[in-house]
């Protein structure tokens, strides 16, 4: 794949937040002029092979009309509640011949039952919806940020989970293997591909595509070693370098003059793809939602 796009978009975009608390009003989500086809055309013209969408970030808001929660696009002004950003982007990818993938945050700061076994069942039902309604996906992205404070149905407290066991990830792997056997599974330790241990877009000058099986898990405390891999590893888990074209992952107007330059992006390419990894470059969608800049300029959604 070499290079592919990340798109962070959701309620955070309209509320100037990075990590939504889970209490933002869905009525604030109204991308009246959104054009997913133009995003994809620009990605294609820039040589990217695919795109990963934040279908649900930590705030719990869903960009598809899930039947599992009211905290979703069905209850927004967008297309009078009949919109589906996941479908619009996946259809655009099919039309222009690049691959589509989804990010699904395991952590959910909106759901009242987060931290209980019932939430895990809810999470897997969401995953099943995404795996069965939108065609082929090339990657499933599980974020390592899990547990902490949140709205949690109005409780407004902090919740701690056992990151090694709470989500029962082998259950996810089995579901994905059955429903989307071609999909690569991303998490801190894979099993398909791994986090590189930083969000700066680079891997170590020596970067092994191996980890010691069973050692790395979401929230792994020695994450900085992931930029190098394990020279004595026995499981193939290639590195993926994720980085945003702006300081933040979601759009913030005060960062309009902080877009990475062509020289900076070129350096990131050499320090990621050139260091035996792939480059996942994030584009924060802004409030105008009109277009992505031409690929001959620094790439950003403007």
Stretches found by the model and what they are:
Residues 1-293, 297:
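Mature catalytic domains of secreted/periplasmic carbohydrate-active enzymes
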Residues 301-302:
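Hydrophobic alpha-helical segments, chiefly the membrane-spanning helices
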